[in-house]
Amino acid sequence: MIHQNLAIMIIILPLVSSVINGLFLNRIDKKLAKIIAISFLLLSALFSLIIFCDATLVGKIIHIKLLPWIEFRNFKVNWSIYIDQLTSIMFIVVTFVSSVVHIYSLGYMANDKGIIRFLSFLSLFTFFMLMLVSADNFLQLFCGWEGVGVCSYLLIGFWYSKESANKAAMKAFITNRVSDFAFILGIITIIIYNGSANYKDVFLSAKLLSNTKILVHFSILDIICLLLSIGCIGKSAQIGLHVWLPDAMEGPTPVSALIHAATMVTAGIFLVARCSYLFEYSPIVLQFITIIGGITCLFAASIAIMQSDIKKIIAYSTCSQLGYMFMACGVSSYNSAIFHLVTHAFFKALLFLSAGSVIHSVNEHNIFKMGNLINKMPITYGNFLIGSLALIGIYPLSGFYSKDLILEAAYSSGSFMFIFGITAAMLTAIYSMKIIILVFHGKTKLEKDVFEHAHEPTKTMNNPLILLVAGSFFSGMLGYYLLSMNKPNGYFHESLFNLHIYKLLINHTPLYIKLLPMAVGIVGIVIGICLYKDSLPYHDALTNKSNKSKKDWIPQSNYKMILFIPNILRNKYYFDEIYNYLIIKPIHCLAYLFYLGDQKIIDRFGPNGFARVINYFCALTCKIQTGYIFNYALYIVSFIVITISYFVWKSIY
């Protein structure tokens, strides 16, 4: 009973905090509002830790049916809380990272008049994510799924007077509606063919659905899994539907940390892992997920190399790491996908918040305009370095364990995407070193006053990052231990499912494959150092500068070819331009045609035209009503003459 109450409190506390601060304390007592927001999140994190320890040591599953929600004939759905090992680890990630972001925001948003509204939105975001991961049915999960989408819209567009923020919020919301439409169709298909939305019932019928063919090569389950995976592709910003993620950087930096590390983008990975019982019986969709994930991790990493905005580089890094997680799910290594999700949450939040400290200090996003901040911000530099090395996958940091496990799984499965993953690992090291060198080690390009006043952030912003540093160090070792438990899928043995034919013999992976990711990362570090040292002649080509003396050694014809690839990467493979040309402009043209049809034809000859005729006759009637007796006498005489003439004409003919 105690654990059940704790489980309820974990989810309810962020909601209560959001409601109290948003509705009551926003304009009354801001100090009390801050205390409530932070204390409620810390309590939620503490209770999550208790539940996690219980799930780890005892293996206990908590299932609470709170109230009946939908009842229609034989179709019943309860509003419930379901906590197993997968949910408990997600609770830890969401509540701990969210708590850090809340505390950090007190310093980062200290001078913002809307800070209480901001904290209210953050708490609401946390609540919906907790609802999503604790659901025991697809309809309740969908409520959390849409909830985080709405909150992302509110937070990305938090500075609503900023036009770019409004556009970014709309872009994120609309892009996710595209994938969510497929997700809704998937849930509807599940309900139609299974008669239930509860996980347990749906998972038990997976094998039967896989044998129910609707096309020659496709089963009902294939269609369901494909629709669900499209929903996950949009939410987790995979290639094609990734375009909203970089623009989400228009919101405050703490929002970026929360969206990219612990909440919205991880929802897609969580759903694929939760539905492993379905996806395992749909090998064709698993192959599709593997390809999407592999392409995304390489595609996003290549774009990150040529970006200049520090937050957008980290955003594309997130997109790339999510590709790794998708690839892991595609090769049935769901445990390594969740493992990387956990480790990534800590070091990516650390990177974003450290970047926020830099931006807060120098009020600049362009890394080519920074430089030599190591002496001004040594603590921030240390935090950023730890986060970057964890991202690259250097031992003994957490990324070494989780990313390598994914690549080992891809190799063991025989997937060609292993090559993509290894290449992306090298690119990850290159763009990580790019940030470190240009922001902290390069020659400063900041104005003298700005550089002299650069400083470490307040303790409110710095101290919470200690938790993320600890997570970046120790979550990898702890996770590796939990996954090494003598059970299928290790710690997640009751949450995840693998068919025997898809189990990966990772223990038999050659040693050189195990060491290859870190070796490639080290090579990438060396390349990054070489590329971004000012003395090298091709540095200017890569940084979009024009220094003729340094490019004279390259033939002019070849120089344009060399710049061709960087220009493609700098423009993000022209995805935005292609979508604008193929989708946005045609929709605008179609909308204009509908406008013409509605305003110029239907309204003109319909209600507006009829109204004009009425107005004309009304005006004519008004002219007749002059008020003079001689005019009325003339009308009467004229009418009598016309009437007599009519009868005379009729009698004659």
UniProtKB/Swiss-Prot annotation:
Gene3D superfamilies: 1.20.5.2700. It comes from the Bacteria. It is an enzyme of class 7 (translocase). It is a multi-pass membrane protein. The keyword DNA-binding does not apply. It catalyses: a quinone + NADH + 5 H(+)(in) = a quinol + NAD(+) + 4 H(+)(out). The chain crosses the membrane at residues 8-28, 35-55, 89-109, 115-135, 138-158, 178-198, 214-234, 253-273, 285-305, 313-333, 336-356, 377-397, 418-438, 465-485, 511-531, 577-597, 629-649. Keywords: Cell membrane, Membrane, NAD, Quinone, Translocase, Transmembrane, Transmembrane helix. GO terms for biological process: ATP synthesis coupled electron transport; electron transport coupled proton transport. Its main location: membrane. InterPro entries: NADHpl_OxRdtase_5_subgr, ND/Mrp_TM, NU5C-like, Proton_antipo_N. Its EC number is 7.1.1.-. One of its GO terms (cellular component) is plasma membrane. It is found in: Cell membrane. GO terms for molecular function: NADH dehydrogenase (ubiquinone) activity; quinone binding. PANTHER family: NADH-UBIQUINONE OXIDOREDUCTASE CHAIN 5 (PTHR42829:SF2). Belongs to the complex I subunit 5 family. NDH-1 shuttles electrons from NADH, via FMN and iron-sulfur (Fe-S) centers, to quinones in the respiratory chain. Couples the redox reaction to proton translocation (for every two electrons transferred, four hydrogen ions are translocated across the cytoplasmic membrane), and thus conserves the redox energy in a proton gradient. NCBIfam families: NDH_I_L, PRK06590.1. This is NADH-quinone oxidoreductase subunit L. It comes from Rickettsia typhi (strain ATCC VR-144 / Wilmington).
